Amino acid sequence: MLKVAIVGKPNVGKSTLFNRIIKVNKSIVDDKPGITRDRIYANAEWLTQHFKLIDTGGLMLDEFDFKKQIELQVNYAITEADVIVFLVSYKEGINNDDHYVAKILKKHKNKKILLAVNKSETRNKDSYDDHEYLRFGFQKPYFISANHGIGIGDLLDAIVDTKLKEIKEEDTFKFCIIGRPNVGKSSLVNCILNEDRMITSNIANTTRDAIDSNFKKDNLLYTIIDTAGIRRKGKIQENVDKYAYLRVEQSISRSNLIVIVLDGSEEFNEQDEVIAGLAHKANIPSIIVVNKWDIVKEKDEKTMNKFIKTIRIKFKFLSWTPIVFLSAIENKRINTLFNEIKSIRENLNLKFNSKILTDLVFKLQMLNSPPLFNRGRIKINHVTQVDGQIPTFVLFCNNPEYLHFSYARYLENEIRKSLGLNNVPITLYFKNKTDKIRGKKNDK
């Protein structure tokens, strides 16, 4: 797939252009320099042509926190991209930072570079000011307004004009990484991807955007989503943190799996419980990762079991969730995490024959009969699997409205155990035996 990077100094509108092209607010936009500090990826389309769009941190000459790391991110993006959109601002004019960016881009002569002059909504169309931008040496400029949508079509025409061999998209398994600030989420992403894709530091909340990264492992395609650290709501003061909190919820909503990262070197706190609650609410598989295991003090053969016991008590609503101990910074026990991810992926794709399911539930009813109600006893006489993000089963019975939640929980736990679905949640729907059901899988 064609890859397109948007590059420029801070505050020229890179994230606004990125959002305009992909038509959603994926990158956090604000007036503060460097608010987009990692490179953000998204799929985009123009005139039936698909391409991958990359937003980057801004390059600038002045001394500035994260300057060197942002420059490294931009260089990664430039190396990776087939087309580079060099964005400058008509409103602010050209300065040394723009020439600095141009100097870097000229080193990449094999790349297609498109100069886009943003914030040009006030420009007179009859003005002859192209020469100021032609000095950069990148053919004719495209005058646009990302905020107002002016000139975007012409720029996109030039982007998709680049010819590349089509690569067939494969099914990808998406998992997001969530946790409070500074528990090592970005270090874990870098460890998995074997590159400094994310800006990492010991300053809490270095990562503010949700960032998608595609990679292959064992011939399977994955998408990993790293998110901003979740603070307690009372501490969410800046707009940026509010946006990031919403982005975490959005990331969860488009994931197949949630990786909850805890800091093993500190006591688990209320924030960790709130984050685990988000995972529970989503009702999709999750894995609890205890990171920084390398710096946990006074470990012995019982330490891990003590941690597991504490986690099971604190997060009792995630009793089925696997727990993995690792050190992202030391690249230790990462394979343990991937073994769990692969197992969950396989379990989510399992399909079960209706006869097997019905026989299983009959046996469970024989072992533990449904409780009586004023009209008699409930009897489940048929079970089938239907489409769902997690294994979803419909149980047909008489008077389902009288089924007690404790018996439903008994069935859920026993079905999960009997079918080997110990590391994923399942959903049970109880329907009247006369109801029709949609989305039923064909039995094999």
Curated annotation (Swiss-Prot):
One GO process term, biological-process aspect: ribosome biogenesis
Coiled coil: none
Domain EngA-type G: 2-167, 173-349
PROSITE patterns the UniProt entry points to: G_ENGA (PS51712)
Gene Ontology molecular function, alphabetical: GTP binding; ribosome binding
Residues that coordinate or bind GTP 2: 179-186, 226-230, 291-294
Ranges where the KH-like domain occurs: 350-434
Residue ranges of the TM segments: none
Signal peptide boundaries: none
Positions contributing to GTP 1 binding: 8-15, 55-59, 118-121
Keywords associated with the record: GTP-binding, Nucleotide-binding, Repeat, Ribosome biogenesis
PANTHER family, per the entry: GTPASE DER (PTHR43834:SF6)
Subunit composition and interactions: Associates with the 50S ribosomal subunit.
Role noted for this protein: GTPase that plays an essential role in the late steps of ribosome biogenesis.
Family as reported in the entry's similarity comment: Belongs to the TRAFAC class TrmE-Era-EngA-EngB-Septin-like GTPase superfamily. EngA (Der) GTPase family.
Protein name, as recorded: GTPase Der
Gene symbol of the encoding locus: der
